[in-house]
């Protein structure tokens, strides 16, 4: 992975101190059978790499991102919650009479 001095890289776009935008090619790809591993491709080859504990891979961020207490769900609105699925936050619903309990990472009776 290339490092750019003086840049903050998010979603494959670098913002430098001079407010310049540069497109950066991300050489990291989601591994379809795992959220906690990714594929790294560069001129030296292709490797499957692990994310650090408590993180999952996000193609949108071109890297591993932290989860709250290792939970891949977060509250959204009432019965709705966001669930991290294949590199994107998807809106899901808890069953009637339940809401997301993020500390348990499940829909639970209120």
From Swiss-Prot:
Residues carrying covalently attached carbohydrate according to the record: 101
Top-level taxon: Eukaryota
Expression tissues: Component of the acid-soluble and acid-insoluble organic matrix of prismatic shell layers (at protein level).
Keywords: Glycoprotein, Secreted, Signal
Subcellular location field: Secreted
A GO cellular component entry from the record: extracellular region
Extent of the signal sequence: 1-19
UniProt keyword Secreted present: yes
Primary subcellular site in the record, as a coarse category: secreted
Descriptive protein name: Uncharacterized protein 7
């Amino acid at each position: 992975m290339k490092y750019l001095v003086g840049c903050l890289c998010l979603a494959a776009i670098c913002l430098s101190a001079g407010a310049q935008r540069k497109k950066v090619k991300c050489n990291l790809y989601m591994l379809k059978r795992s959220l906690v591993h990714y594929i790294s491709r560069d001129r030296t080859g292709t490797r499957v790499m692990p994310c650090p504990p408590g993180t999952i891979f996000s193609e949108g961020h071109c890297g591993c991102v932290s989860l709250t207490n290792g939970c891949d769900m977060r509250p959204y609105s009432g019965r709705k919650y966001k669930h991290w699925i294949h590199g994107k936050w998807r809106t899901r619903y808890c069953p009637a009479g339940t809401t997301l309990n993020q500390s348990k990472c499940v829909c639970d009776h209120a």
